[in-house]
């Protein structure tokens, strides 16, 4: 009898001890990053709203989320409603996006709006008469009207339904081309093609579609009296040629319109650096210390233009399980760069959003996540448990 009681007592004490360990106070990552001037966030898909473990991580350690696809135009635009609209302007279905923003609001997280204008994967019918891809393209005038209406409706919807939750928008995404994707005479390098496919925004509106998008976004934010920051977002932003073209573009955006007194209106507040760091689908180029200097220089260069900077889609790539310690060391050094650039009074870096949050050790080389994020690149393992790299970053931030 005594032995049975002893066993029962042990069984009762084991879970209690486990709970005690789990309940030990943890410093949220975002509290540590905010002490250095920048938010800490992660990506969230609609399906992850049912992943309780990941949601708990976001609630505990993040103060920002970005919807991976659900706030993009191709997810929001509703063809049947657009065709039936009385004013000929586009209409949207916000149901999935609303659930995600509502979750953020309920749990005290801000949302990066991503993204208003992006040529990739865009619904073709948006550019055609009667919203029918089988009919001719609309005129520049009509396309500008549709663009203004779309941007105005989307920003207004989220601000009025969830006041203050969407704290910034990527207004335009990846408009700066590379290689032969732009007119060499254009210092902004506005892309005319992507992977051999024409940029329909460029073809229907012209190369100034970016400036108009920012004008419409700024006018909407001003009319709402909202505190929403407006970003231009792109990849390869820390390489010199792309960086210089982005600077030329932001200068063009911020000199495009004037206020009532004739002074230039600042339409663009900052640059989103996507932050896919390392080889695309290959270990070659991963954890290259030279990238740390490039990132630091890029942040400072954009800041010198009066722009704030956010790392918006960060994945520190690693494809080799044997190099997880090297990966952790590189990640810590990267966060040291973030802290260092913010040591002055201006603190130009205002946010870091990690998209390569999880390990995918069984990913195949042909998959999208393999190429974009790598297999052993996460702050969390494949089960969503924080890895040593996560705690090493926390320890460094506490120093």
Per-region residue spans from a language model:
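Acidic-and-aromatic substrate-binding clefts and catalytic sites of carbohydrate-active enzymes
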Residues: 43-55, 74-77, 82, 88-95, ...
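Short, acidic/polar
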Residues: 46-61, 147-157, 242-258, 295, ...
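Boundary/entry segment of secreted carbohydrate-active catalytic domains
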Residues: 22-64, 68-70
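Short loop/turn motifs at secondary-structure junctions
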Residues: 4, 61, 162-165, 267, ...
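Substrate-binding cleft and catalytic face of glycoside hydrolase catalytic domains
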Residues: 30, 60-81, 87-237, 307, ...
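Glycoside hydrolase catalytic-domain groove-lining segments
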Residues: 94-95, 102-106, 203-233, 238-322, ...
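Sec-dependent N-terminal signal peptides of Gram-positive bacterial secreted proteins and lipoproteins
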Residues: 3-20
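Aromatic-rich peripheral "rim/lid" segments of glycoside hydrolase catalytic domains that contact
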Residues: 28, 77, 157-160, 164, ...
């Amino acid at each position: 009898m005594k032995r049975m009681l002893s066993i029962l007592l042990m069984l009762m004490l084991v879970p209690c001890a486990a709970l005690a360990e789990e309940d030990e106070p943890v410093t949220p990552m975002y509290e540590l990053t905010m002490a250095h001037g920048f938010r800490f966030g992660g990506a969230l898909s609609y399906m992850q709203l049912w992943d309780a473990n990941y949601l708990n991580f976001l609630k505990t350690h993040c103060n920002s989320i970005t919807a991976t696809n659900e706030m993009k135009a191709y997810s929001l635009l509703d063809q049947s409603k657009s065709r039936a609209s009385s004013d000929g302007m586009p209409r949207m279905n916000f149901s999935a996006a609303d659930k995600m923003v509502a979750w953020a609001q309920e749990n005290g997280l801000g949302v990066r709006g991503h993204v208003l204008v992006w040529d990739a994967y865009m619904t073709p019918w948006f550019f055609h008469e009667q919203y029918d891809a089988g009919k001719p393209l609309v005129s520049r005038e009509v396309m500008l009207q549709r663009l203004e209406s779309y941007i105005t409706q989307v920003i207004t919807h989220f601000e009025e339904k969830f006041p203050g939750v969407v704290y910034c928008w990527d207004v335009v995404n990846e408009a700066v081309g590379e290689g032969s994707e732009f007119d060499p005479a254009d210092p902004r390098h506005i892309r005319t093609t992507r992977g051999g496919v024409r940029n329909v925004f460029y073809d229907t509106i012209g190369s100034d579609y970016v400036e108009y998008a920012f004008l419409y976004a700024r006018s909407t934010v001003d009319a709402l009296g909202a505190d929403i920051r407006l970003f231009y977002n792109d990849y390869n932003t820390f390489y010199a040629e792309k960086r210089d073209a982005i600077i030329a573009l932001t200068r063009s955006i911020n000199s495009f319109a004037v206020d009532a007194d004739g002074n230039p209106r600042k339409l663009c507040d900052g640059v989103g650096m996507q932050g896919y760091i390392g080889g695309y689908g290959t270990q070659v180029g991963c954890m290259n210390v030279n990238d740390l200097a490039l990132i630091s220089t890029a942040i400072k260069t954009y800041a010198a233009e009066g722009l704030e900077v956010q790392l918006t889609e960060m994945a520190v790539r690693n494809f080799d399980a044997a190099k997880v310690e090297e990966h952790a060391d590189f990640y810590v050094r990267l966060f040291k760069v973030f802290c260092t650039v913010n040591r002055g009074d201006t603190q130009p870096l205002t946010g870091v959003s990690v998209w390569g949050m999880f390990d995918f050790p069984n990913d195949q080389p042909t998959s999208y996540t393999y190429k974009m994020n790598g297999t052993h690149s996460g702050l969390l393992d494949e089960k969503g448990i924080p890895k040593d790299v996560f705690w090493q970053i926390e320890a460094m931030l506490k120093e």
